[in-house]
Amino acid sequence: RVNEKPAELKIERIGASDDRPAPLTAEKLLRGLQGAVMFVRGSATLFENWSESFLATINELPPADQAYCQSIGGDPNIFYFHSAWQLADDEVFVIDAPEIPECQTWNFQLDNWWMESLDYRHHTIHVNKHTAHYNDDGSVRVVVSHADPGVPNWIETAGHNMGTLCW
């Protein structure tokens, strides 16, 4: 983000007709609120169950079930790795990627229990194809820890002791 320039956009609505909505009725409001409740419950259950399943491979980074990822809307052009992580204050989690296939882009990031990215605005919680330090042999080593160990590709936990991760 240090080298990126903010986008400059102009949005203009063209071909607009008078499409003002009808007044909100009690019935429409009720349906909307019921739908919101169903969405929140469904999302919370989905991510809770998914994160629970990652506990079997804590502090590892195995390939995810690609068919499952695609069945819930994952991009078939992406090969997913998911797991959970947990670190004490004095621990580090080292991920070695000896060979990364040629691709347009890749990204590794730390997430919270609900699979939301950690605070990327104030912390370095991800590394990608364009920001990574590559070793001479083309491999990449990512180091996750609470404190900066002074190595390339350090990912900080942003004050969290546990969460999920995705490559």
Roles of regions detected by a PLM:
Residues 1-167:
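A compositional/structural signature for long, glycine/proline-rich flexible linkers
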